C-alpha cells in the first residue's frame, strides 16, 4: 500500500541531502515536490496545500541541532504531520450498549457484507465479544446468502428473515433476538446506496432511528481515491456517521482517501481492510501508517500479528525438537502455515523497516506457499521425518505428485537444509550466549 507515494516522498527528501541547514529556499523546493507527490496520490488539493504550509511553518521555526541533518528533521516533521492528518491516534468503536449495535452503511461494491463478517470475527477473537450478524440487505440478489456463508465460516450466529422485505423491521427483530439470546454485539449489514438516492437515504435514516446504533460505520473502497472522500462527505451530511472503514487498502498504491478523509469529513478512520482473508481487518493507527508511508516499517503491528498466532505449547515443542536436532519437514510445514495466518507476505514485508523498499520490485507471491505445502504433503511420513533419505527417484515421485518440477523440489530441500543448519547453530553455546544477551522476542523459543 502507498508504494507510489512512499517512493515520491523519498525522492523529495533527497533535495535536502548535503544541505547544511534548513532555509526558506530549500524547504520551499522540497515541499513543492512533496505537494506534487500528495496530489499525484489523489489527496484533496486543500488538504495537500494546508499540509505543506504547516510543515513549512514548523520546519522554519525549528532550531536545528548540529547533530540533526536538515533532511532528517524534515522527515520527522512530515511524519508527525502525516499522523495528525490521519487523526493523530487510533479511535476505538463504541461498544457500551447492551447489546452494542453497529450499523454498516456505504455504496454498492464497497465491501460492506464481507466487512461485516470481518468485524464480527475481529470482535469475537480480539475483544471476546459475542456478536450477532443481522442481514438487512433485501435488494441485492444473494446478499443474505453471502452473509450466511460468511457467518458459518467464522462461526458467528446470523439473524435472517427471508419472508420480510422491510429492512427496518428486520433490524428491530435482530436486536430483539440478540437481547433474547444474550449476544452482546449486533452488526447490521445494510444495502448499498448512493447519497443522491432519496428513497434509500430515507430508508437508512429509518434503520438508524429504529436500531439506535452505538456506532454507525461508513464503509468505503480506498481504491476509489478522491471519489471515496466526496462520497463520505455527502453521506455524513445526511447520516452523521461515527467513523470510516477503508476497504481494499492493500491494493491502494496512492493513498489519497486515507490521507484526505479525516480532514474533509471530520470523522476518524477506525478500521482498514488489508486483504481478502477474513482476518485481514486492522484497527487504524495513524502513527503506524505514517511510519509505513515514510518507509519506516511497522514493527508494532508485526509483533501484534505474531502474538495473535503465538502458540506457547507449539513453541515449547519446537524448542525441544530444535535442541535435539530433530527439526523435520513436519515442523517446517507447521512454521509456514503459521506465517500464512499472519497475512499476505508483501504486507508483512512492508512492516519491516527497509525490507518493503528492498522488495518493491520483487513479485512476492503468496501462492508460492501452496507449492511448498504441496511438495511436503506429497512426501511419505517417513520422508518428512527423515529428509536425508530423499534420493533422486523419491524427489521425482514427489515432484510428480505435487505438480511441481524436480528443480522446485531440490530448491525446497536446499532451503530446508539451510534452515535446519541455522536451527542447529542456535543450539550451540556461542549462540545461546549471544541470544541470552538479547531481549526475548514474542513467539521465539528460549534457548537453554
Give short role names for the model-derived ranges.
Residues 2-19, 288-448:
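Long amphipathic alpha-helical segments used for membrane anchoring, targeting, substrate engagement
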